[in-house]
């Protein structure tokens, strides 16, 4: 398959891209082009400014991918800048369990209502993290219902290449 990974040079994106390559997929990564990677000529590269609509349009318009895996969309505008310009058979949005409000011990997928909540186009700095992630999903549910998309909601993401030191923070504060 022809797969576009938006992100993919840091954190668990590295492992994802390597696994996709191992499985024989034709992988393109879309990044700012600032973080070195070890993929060599095994991937195609597209340089983007993720939060700039014109950059996204120029980089993606007219291109087709079987699958787009968007690892770095945070807000509704991030979703729009991909969904309006790239042609794909399936869009996979890496979301977060932060979209659930309230989140509780027995949270299930249907606890999230993407259809009837108040939707706004927004940028990353307009609301706290959980609100911009909700707006990103509201965009998918309300503005792109005819497209084939899925939201993968991670509860907590860690790996051996965690540059955020997220787990270390909790270990040190126990």
Please give the residue ranges for each predicted region.
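Rossmann-fold cofactor-recognition segment
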Residues: 41-53, 73
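Glycine/proline-rich active-site loop of Rossmann-fold NAD(P)-dependent oxidoreductases
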Residues: 159-170
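Conserved beta-loop-beta element that borders a ligand/cofactor-binding pocket
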Residues: 95, 137-160
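NAD(P)-cofactor binding segment of oxidoreductase domains
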Residues: 63-120, 135-137
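Short amphipathic alpha-helix with an adjacent loop that forms part of the alpha/beta core around
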Residues: 54-63
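N-terminal Rossmann-fold cofactor-binding loop
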Residues: 30-34, 49-50
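Short loop/helix-cap segments at secondary-structure boundaries that form the rim of catalytic
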Residues: 34-42, 84-85
